[in-house]
Swiss-Prot record:
The modification N6-acetyllysine is found at residues 55, 57, 119, 157, 171, 182, 197, 207, 210, 214, 219, 228, 279-280, 287, 307, 310, 412, 453, 458, 522, 527, 532, 553, 560, 575, 603, 612, 630, 751, 757, 772, 793, 811, 831, 841, 856, 875, 889, 892, 908, 915, 919, 935, 1074, 1100, 1168, 1183, 1222, 1232, 1269, 1291, 1356, 1444, 1471, 1479, 1486. The modification Phosphoserine is found at residues 148, 189, 537, 540, 569, 896, 898, 1036, 1079, 1090, 1093, 1203, 1419, 1431. Residues 39-218 are annotated as: Anthranilate phosphoribosyltransferase homolog. It is a peripheral membrane protein. CDD domains: GATase1_CPSase, MGS_CPS_I_III. Primarily in the liver and small intestine. It is an enzyme of class 6 (ligase). It catalyses: hydrogencarbonate + NH4(+) + 2 ATP = carbamoyl phosphate + 2 ADP + phosphate + 2 H(+). One of its GO terms (biological process) is response to lipopolysaccharide. It comes from Rattus norvegicus. Its EC number is 6.3.4.16. The keyword Cell inner membrane does not apply. This is Carbamoyl-phosphate synthase [ammonia], mitochondrial.
Amino acid sequence: MTRILTACKVVKTLKSGFGLANVTSKRQWDFSRPGIRLLSVKAQTAHIVLEDGTKMKGYSFGHPSSVAGEVVFNTGLGGYSEALTDPAYKGQILTMANPIIGNGGAPDTTARDELGLNKYMESDGIKVAGLLVLNYSHDYNHWLATKSLGQWLQEEKVPAIYGVDTRMLTKIIRDKGTMLGKIEFEGQSVDFVDPNKQNLIAEVSTKDVKVFGKGNPTKVVAVDCGIKNNVIRLLVKRGAEVHLVPWNHDFTQMDYDGLLIAGGPGNPALAQPLIQNVKKILESDRKEPLFGISTGNIITGLAAGAKSYKMSMANRGQNQPVLNITNRQAFITAQNHGYALDNTLPAGWKPLFVNVNDQTNEGIMHESKPFFAVQFHPEVSPGPTDTEYLFDSFFSLIKKGKGTTITSVLPKPALVASRVEVSKVLILGSGGLSIGQAGEFDYSGSQAVKAMKEENVKTVLMNPNIASVQTNEVGLKQADAVYFLPITPQFVTEVIKAERPDGLILGMGGQTALNCGVELFKRGVLKEYGVKVLGTSVESIMATEDRQLFSDKLNEINEKIAPSFAVESMEDALKAADTIGYPVMIRSAYALGGLGSGICPNKETLMDLGTKAFAMTNQILVERSVTGWKEIEYEVVRDADDNCVTVCNMENVDAMGVHTGDSVVVAPAQTLSNAEFQMLRRTSINVVRHLGIVGECNIQFALHPTSMEYCIIEVNARLSRSSALASKATGYPLAFIAAKIALGIPLPEIKNVVSGKTSACFEPSLDYMVTKIPRWDLDRFHGTSSRIGSSMKSVGEVMAIGRTFEESFQKALRMCHPSVDGFTPRLPMNKEWPANLDLRKELSEPSSTRIYAIAKALENNMSLDEIVKLTSIDKWFLYKMRDILNMDKTLKGLNSESVTEETLRQAKEIGFSDKQISKCLGLTEAQTRELRLKKNIHPWVKQIDTLAAEYPSVTNYLYVTYNGQEHDIKFDEHGIMVLGCGPYHIGSSVEFDWCAVSSIRTLRQLGKKTVVVNCNPETVSTDFDECDKLYFEELSLERILDIYHQEACNGCIISVGGQIPNNLAVPLYKNGVKIMGTSPLQIDRAEDRSIFSAVLDELKVAQAPWKAVNTLNEALEFANSVGYPCLLRPSYVLSGSAMNVVFSEDEMKRFLEEATRVSQEHPVVLTKFIEGAREVEMDAVGKEGRVISHAISEHVEDAGVHSGDATLMLPTQTISQGAIEKVKDATRKIAKAFAISGPFNVQFLVKGNDVLVIECNLRASRSFPFVSKTLGVDFIDVATKVMIGESVDEKHLPTLEQPIIPSDYVAIKAPMFSWPRLRDADPILRCEMASTGEVACFGEGIHTAFLKAMLSTGFKIPQKGILIGIQQSFRPRFLGVAEQLHNEGFKLFATEATSDWLNANNVPATPVAWPSQEGQNPSLSSIRKLIRDGSIDLVINLPNNNTKFVHDNYVIRRTAVDSGIALLTNFQVTKLFAEAVQKARTVDSKSLFHYRQYSAGKAA
């Protein structure tokens, strides 16, 4: 809501509606806008007053006249123009639950259709007595709009106010029943009026008989009880000549083929003349069909002898589920009625439909005559068109003759399913996290396991992602067996042989699981072992994944897709592009996250992108580019009974051309009309039905911004990133529901777990909105452009919840990175815009920083039309963004003395943080907080209940907003707060979600109440049933303090969520928060690298020579004294941000500048880099300075590779016992010195028996899940008990004195990289972390474990040739490796000098040309050609800084990645690979539990 920023529109509406001189109750507005003079405008206030005494203040945007009526609410997400003109609202003051109204303005209210009916309205004008909304869009945008909503309301003299907590109002009506109310302006007192005592039907009915569709063959008499225009349209469309008669017209003697009664408002029992006329028809011999709609249902029932009653709160909205009693099929319906028939029907009549939620009557039918009626609105407008088929049924009755009933003409359900009988189900996970396939599948897989357990189905989970919650082996919500194995057809087949499941779920493991399942189907494995694919069939999956099949399927139902050709060669791709015309879009089959896709403006780009795409797949789609169109997504659920619901629709703020995973996304869609919304919804359901999807799927549309033209982009027949977002945005647990559906359970029988009362067969209503913003880490990848497009690049995302776009948008921006204050022109991480910035180019070429470029353009007074032209972003979003910057300017003109409570409150309502405000007012954040609280401005806690408060909810799913007037919940539990990890990014991924979930579960097992704060929709920790209270909120000092104090928490755990919460330790502590575990003062000493190094010196714990430096001269002086290379490290960072090995003075200058930018408040530490050392990790739990649990793992790679990118071995393989004892001794000293109570991690360098400390983190590390699962001891469980002061049984813990060292198996943790997505990035490892995920596997020895782990990362073991590229210094060490590879039968290729050296040492090698020298020597083959034709299927490239072929080596590495072949760039990993290939002839399918069982058997 932008109250302070909307004065221009207020002026317009005030001038057009009434004179300013009449305003009595006034509110001062401050307003400034570029190009517009400063205005001082007074906005009129009014109150909504209820008969129970409730009084709420609001601000007028309609006609300034008091009015009385019955206050009702509508939870619909769209179609306010249609709703306002619905005659059923006559005499009622309508409360819209949708928090933002007026986005699309008002259409042409004078336009008429071919029947002479108002084209965009459901009657001849607005019928509501008044309108109440939370937030009104003064600035509107839609291609059909001709004026603002406020202007239209004033023209029709209808009062409307905004600024009302509509959720609070809805709850009052819900709990107390519909009640009388009034909108009162000062000086215009009115009495309460009960419209139900009036015959409202008479007021809205036509006064004359009117005929529509004259000359049509079927005569239908339509009795107007407040009939909607769309009823008439639908009748005429089907060939009716409609005779519209007044409500009291005697139609009993009229000649007709069918009789329809439709409407309307008020108490139907008051329409006695109509009831008597219908009674005559029912009791006569006339058997022409009768169809009653809404009031027509009650009128028909009353005429038949049934009774009606006034409902306590009415059914008004667009998501009411009804069940056809005759065939058990469910439909989503639009409803608007306050009266209903009771369930005792007279003889000869029976119910036809029933409400799934409240079991009220929704329709009746005669048992022998063609009479039927429904309580809902099959003509909708606004709302879903699911039951429009009833008009067809009505006409079928007319055509069939007079002696039949409605059941004979209703369409038969497409499917009648039965429960799928399975006893054991195999669930395929997605493997390690990668760009495009991240933590959302941990969430969805965990939900699927939970659903199976609820239904007493045994589950076998196959997933090598050691860091995921779903791969826990112990717990009530865990699978019965877990296999840490590669998700490949070979290994899945072995698991099927061993476990003999009778069911298989493919939809919870992303593209990995889907592709694997398709291959198993094609190979006949599933048929051979009698495994049923649950949910969507493989044939349907193939129809969505194969681009040609998909196109053919859509053509079968005449659905719109972009003109396209599926091709299998570059030659055909070029021909297709010529036929379609450039620009074209290419898409790969069976690909994830837009991999292998891109926009090709010309032939050269198509050649480049197409060649890379064909390296990954055998088929691509070449299609017309719809860049610049709107991108809209729907999440659709369909059960085996053909019941369909659309759970969520989402709108990409970024237009087509940017992958949805890289787009800013809002839910629900904000700029669609009801016609657009329902058109795409209807299409979604039609497509999903035709494709045979059973479960959940995502469908993406391109919608033309100024017409109704659309095309379908793709369908994902599985849970996806968007599914996880939709689940968290709505509270509807999509994965859980999809898993139940896969067992054949129909939707109406599944409970809505959020409300605890309603069915899962419904479409959620939102009285808030969410904004998703991606998190990129492109700066980490050298050579990668910040430009984004159709291939996804983001590594994570956040979701923010608010009740205005501005609020959720600014929250989301801050959630993405702690350095961001909100929507500002400043770049994240304190970066500066380049001096030669081309702002127009920044806007026209989407990038990871374009949102800040938009802010900069607005700051520079660029016009909105120009920004729209450059970005194709809908102007409505830009209006809102401009409003934020206008508030920023307003605040900058004030100070702590002059800023008013009103202005401060308005800033908070549009998402300004205290920190943001403090920078405008010249205060500190603490001073701003103090000022705000002094003015009694505080946030409100609201629930996400899936129903917009329509039903009471048991949900604990919460968010915080300044747009409200009451809390939804009580604060009487005083739980322990646990801070989650925030957005996934490089260095902080699913492993920290595992830590948080483990801690939460331990607390709950101990009987402690938990309060969780996190903002990542991909996580299990943000699953509302994991904790007692879930706040989907910012991990900022301000918001944590808000929640902590409001909840009166008993303490806060910050050490299980990674670096973001850890960085809050000291600020929270200084603000009085009780930090559980290690003291924040000790955390501060450890995080500050300078202080930590000094402490180690005091403890006489060995470390490499170091120095804290503040200037370049200090750094150069130190480096010259100890010699290069040196390691440069900033403080308080995660995953090696700005950490670099420095080899020269030039590098020192460059890297030091970067390090000081990311860590401005703390000194940078320089350390002598120790070459040739092995890195060792110590993961441990301390208790009051004593180590009570520990695990030591070893890196395969030598030091210099970030620990997050390293391959870990547990137990250690090459470290001497003497060195291990030194590691333990140093750990003891550190634990004692820092009085550690909780989790911590220490990293060591080991060279021979020398042991040096690298760093210590007084929090959980990313290797905690790995060591916990490997050793069978949950380190976080232990740490949590320590932190809250619970006793810990140390007898079975791996203490320093009695370690647990596996003897029968070895665990290998391997990193997952996403190099193919990061176009032009150099795929080589450095100090700064680059991996996006991890996997772990187990084997009897290191070699089998290593090969399993490598295969789990997608590594393909070569079958033909290996290209070797090594620098001269590597040769002596590499010769043995080369001999091993040659002996294993691989053909070796090498550049000329290396080839000569290998041949001279009796290792045959074929010489090849460097890429830059291709063609110079005809006898030397091209590396790129050999790779692309498959002669080379592994590249070993071991460069150093001394080579003169730096660029050539980069080209070779990049070619390997772009061609989808294996690449090794580390000598130690290459050496282990060669050994593994030689020694591990076969790789078994055993997993951790097999080895544990063997160990237990030996022990017994």
